[in-house]
């Protein structure tokens, strides 16, 4: 039984690591309110020196999220502690227990934060590690699970909404299952799922103090989010001007498909408009749920229209993005009909490796699941939600 439990926990860890890799490199989809597990930050008394951000309306919501994971035992090839931070679902500042290096995957953020601010962020990760490890040790000792492999996960953060207000979220998970959620309105912890009163009391007494969590969600996290947002605004010149490209190809029924692609978008809001004789005929506005990440911290979007052969010169594409207003003609030379024009390669790391990476990572996921389930535990059904994965064994 001990071996079986360890193997099951190890399988859950491998799947969770694969999930993180997919999310980091391919981007994530928008989920419902606070569906991710996050953990740690101020488990102990701290002195608050940050001013509460001034309420100010924004064009689009922004999110700062922390994902943490701690293992009760050392597993070869896996970090015993892992932290990932996300700004608007873009990963940056990974931290692993077995590595003394903490580096940003989003250089625009690091380059424009003061050195002392960046150092404080790194120090916080080490404190969070100790707090999460201590909580995990206490839980396993209380339940007599010291010799088994167990996982404690946490997810917390805050969202800056369009009206300038903020809301926070904080969840804890154990062995792939949600077990504690913080209610920001009542300032209490709730135990997820059915549980005895004794278990509820046990979990609640091990949770971070409500007053410290409130301070983090109401003050510290929004202030950090505002700093990251300001650093991106100050670093917009690093992205260069947005780039607009128009391509065309023959359509089988006597039409030409014009495609307008916009690259190097530094926020998740943009509007693309097709103009005929400088008058709008088709317009699409992209937001956080429809714009595409390029994989390098910028975004991209595209829109197509079908026209009659010979009309290409009548059309142009207009991009409105921040302070930029760019017009690109649909045709600068006579098109060659009868042959499909090759589309230019999409810029950005994510687009260059997206298909091959998705194939490789999907294969890895299948191999891991199949190998572990068939050779070690029998058929399994996997369920993943908000970064937490659980499984049912099929007999």
UniProtKB/Swiss-Prot annotation:
Glycans are attached at residues 98, 163, 199. SMART domains: IGc1. Residues 332-352 are annotated as: Disordered. Residues 149-240 are annotated as: Alpha-2. Residues 370-395 form a propeptide. A lipid is attached at residue 369 (GPI-anchor amidated serine). Residues 57-148 are annotated as: Alpha-1. The keyword Signal applies. Keywords: Cell membrane, Disulfide bond, Glycoprotein, GPI-anchor, Lipoprotein, Membrane, Signal. Residues 241-337 are annotated as: Alpha-3. Residues 338-368 are annotated as: Connecting peptide. This is MHC class I-like protein MILL1. It comes from Mus musculus (Mouse).
């Amino acid at each position: 039984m001990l071996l079986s439990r360890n193997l099951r926990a190890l399988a859950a860890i491998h799947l969770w690591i694969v999930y993180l890799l997919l999310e980091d490199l391919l981007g994530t989809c928008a989920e419902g309110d606070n569906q991710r597990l996050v953990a740690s930050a101020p488990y102990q008394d701290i002195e608050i020196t940050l001013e509460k951000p001034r309420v100010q309306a924004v064009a689009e919501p922004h999110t700062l999220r922390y994902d943490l994971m701690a293992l009760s035992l050392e597993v070869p090839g896996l970090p015993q502690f892992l932290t990932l931070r996300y700004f608007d679902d873009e990963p940056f500042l990974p931290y692993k227990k077995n590595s003394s290096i903490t580096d940003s995957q989003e250089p625009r953020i690091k380059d424009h934060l003061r050195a002392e601010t960046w150092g404080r962020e790194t120090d916080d990760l080490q404190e969070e590690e100790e707090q999460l490890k201590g909580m995990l040790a206490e839980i396993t000792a209380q339940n007599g699970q010291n010799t088994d492999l167990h996982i404690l996960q946490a997810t917390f953060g805050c969202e800056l909404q369009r009206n300038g207000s903020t809301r926070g979220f904080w969840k804890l998970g154990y062995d792939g299952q949600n077990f504690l959620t913080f209610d920001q309105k009542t300032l209490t912890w709730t135990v997820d799922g059915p549980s005895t009163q004794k278990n509820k009391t046990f979990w609640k007494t091990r949770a971070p103090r409500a007053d410290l969590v409130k301070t983090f969600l109401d003050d510290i996290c929004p202030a950090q989010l505002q700093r990251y947002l300001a650093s991106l605004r100050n670093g917009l010149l690093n992205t260069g001007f947005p780039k607009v490209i128009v391509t065309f190809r023959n359509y089988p029924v006597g039409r030409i498909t014009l495609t307008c692609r916009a690259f190097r978008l530094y926020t998740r809001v943009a509007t693309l408009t097709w103009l005929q004789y400088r008058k709008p005929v088709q317009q699409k506005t992209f937001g956080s749920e429809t714009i595409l990440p390029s994989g390098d911290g910028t975004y991209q979007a595209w829109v197509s229209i079908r026209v009659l052969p010979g009309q290409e010169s009548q059309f142009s594409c207009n991009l409105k993005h921040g302070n930029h207003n760019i017009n690109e003609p649909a045709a600068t030379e006579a098109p060659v009909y009868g042959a499909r024009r090759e589309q230019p390669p999409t810029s950005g790391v994510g687009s260059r490796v997206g298909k091959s990476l998705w194939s490789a990572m999907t294969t890895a996921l299948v191999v891991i699941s199949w190998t572990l389930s068939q050779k070690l535990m029998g058929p399994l059904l996997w369920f993943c939600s908000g970064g937490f994965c659980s499984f049912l064994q099929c007999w």
